[in-house]
């Protein structure tokens, strides 16, 4: 589950960040983060026309290449994923350009032209872990339910660059496997996994399920 949020970065430093749910009071809110964006701008005391770039932690262009990889190799109806992109982007004269790691397009808001980058989900996870770390070079492993069509990425970070070495694609996902057990225990999958993590402190491996799962 991707929760709507916004963050403002100036000269490589995070100035403000806020999830939309804190402002609209809707748990796990997935609406366009208008209030969160306004909060960040107000926090930094700047206007929207002072923004140079916009980055999104998901690359919808990957979905334009094929349908659900669980069922088919090619997409049959692209409209299934159009809701991921605001209308003003879809109607833009410059179409979304496809790339393996990120896609971009330019839009005009008033007189200002903005570059919008759609970065693959797992690359964002990798950057979030590597760049704030004290390491100049490091092996990186990302694993969640699903990115665009990846479930696991093996990468290496070297100074200011991150290189993808290998990827695992859905449905082969340890994250989805974990979510299945979250639902089995009576919780909401893709939302309550943290509760299962907390419960694990009270568990014991000396039971009949341990060997079965292993």
Name what the model sees in each region.
Residues 1-214:
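Short acidic/glycine-rich loops and adjacent helix/strand connectors
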């Amino acid at each position: 589950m991707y929760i709507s949020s916004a963050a403002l970065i100036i000269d490589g430093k995070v100035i403000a960040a806020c999830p939309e749910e804190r402002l609209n009071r809707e748990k796990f809110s997935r609406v366009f983060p208008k209030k969160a964006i306004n909060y960040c701008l107000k926090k930094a005391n700047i206007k929207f026309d002072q923004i140079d770039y916009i980055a999104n932690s998901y690359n919808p262009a990957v979905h334009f290449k094929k349908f659900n990889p669980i069922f088919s190799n090619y997409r049959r109806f692209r409209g299934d994923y159009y809701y991921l992109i605001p209308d003003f982007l879809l109607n833009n004269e410059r179409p979304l350009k496809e790339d393996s790691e990120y896609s971009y397009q330019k839009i005009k808001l008033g007189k200002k032209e903005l570059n919008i980058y759609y970065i693959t989900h797992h690359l964002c996870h990798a950057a979030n872990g590597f760049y704030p770390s004290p390491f100049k070079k490091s092996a990186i492993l990302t694993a969640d339910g699903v990115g665009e069509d990846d479930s696991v990425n093996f990468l290496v970070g070297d100074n200011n660059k991150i290189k993808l070495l290998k990827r695992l694609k859905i449905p082969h996902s340890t994250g989805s496997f974990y979510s299945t057990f979250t639902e089995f225990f009576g919780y909401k999958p893709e939302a309550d996994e943290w509760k299962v993590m907390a419960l694990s402190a009270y568990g014991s491996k000396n039971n009949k399920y341990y060997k079965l799962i292993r």
